[in-house]
Amino acid sequence: MKIPFVSFEKMHDEIKDELTGKFQQVLAKNWFIQGEELAKFEEEYAAYCGVKYCVGVGNGLDALFLPLKAYGIGTGDEVIVPSNTFIATALAVSYTGATPVFVEPTLESFDIDPAGIEEKITDKTKAIMAVHLYGQPAPMDEIMEIAKCHNLKVIEDSAQAHGALYKGKHVGSLGDGAGFSFYPGKNLGALGDAGAFVTNDKELADKVRALGNYGSDYKYHHIYQGNNSRLDEMQAAFLRIKLKNLDRWNANRIETAEKYLAGIRNPEIALPTIMPDTKHVFHIFAIRCARRDELEKFLNEKGIGTNKHYPIPMHLQGAYENLGIKKGELPLAEEISATELSIPMYYGMTEEETGYVIDAINAFK
């Protein structure tokens, strides 16, 4: 049996006619940027997240970079970032001219450790990037309390957590604002690159919108030195269709995760933990194994697709060697990078496929 790491086939088969019909509608209108589909998606996604404002942007990186820029964060400033994350979280900080300050996760949640945040705050610190890694909400109460005490902004990196809940509230509604990626592989994915920023702060939303539209507040009137980062009509239209199905698709992922959690019984494997008062949406089902590379080879030989998220922590990436952080300085992030393995997780996995993965992992010795 061959089981891919990720597959969109069943998801897209279910909505193929809707996607095709919407494509024809947008094509017929001959309006492809900043039109009706974008306005409707922004309204619908803001309502879904439980916030007042949504600004469509070109990708998930811009959804993090633009609010930092809007806050005036730049050269000489520092922003707290977990070291075990996708590099976009750190690049968003770097693009402003500020310095990312890397912090350890906890092995239990994979998310940033609030105690580590406190240790890294200086008089240069301006914000915290709260990443909901793999679909597991970060400990937002603690993070927001720290931010309040030190007068810091909190931007949620919700790129992997569409639909996740923290104490009954959607991620994206908990900090000062949040960036989402709609990269095709996400729980809510476009058919190309796309992203959005959400917030309850009108002034912030307006500035992010202007910065992503060449710094313009209206046509040919430019109040900032901005960028070109806009969610186009076609992707917005596709995302509107997918948003209607997101909760159902997430429920299916959670069912698959529950089967994994109940069925994997190998003493060499550490399973993910669902933290209290959260709804984990399992963008990634991340296991850990001291013999990770051997396990990966074993599973791949059985036709099971895998991935690593992420094999090199941010502080050891060549892009950040200028920070001078040595191997061993952030040991928990390094341990996760050395032991984490992501196994198949996508909408529509069958009982047979899930069982095959479970049996293969349990057979690893």
Predicted regions and their residues:
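Extreme N-terminal starter segment of soluble prokaryotic enzymes
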Residues: 1-5
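Short beta-strand-to-turn element immediately C-terminal to the catalytic PLP-Schiff-base lysine
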Residues: 180-181, 195-200, 240
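Phosphate-binding glycine-rich loop
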Residues: 31-78, 92-96, 102-104, 169
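PLP-dependent aminotransferase class I/II
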Residues: 9, 21, 36-43, 48-54, ...
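Glycine-rich phosphate-binding segment of PLP-dependent enzymes
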Residues: 10-32
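PLP-dependent aminotransferase-like
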Residues: 69-158, 165, 364
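Conserved active-site segment immediately N-terminal to the catalytic lysine
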Residues: 156-191, 218-223
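Structural detector of well-ordered beta-strand residues that form the stable sheet scaffold
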Residues: 55, 80, 101, 154-155, ...
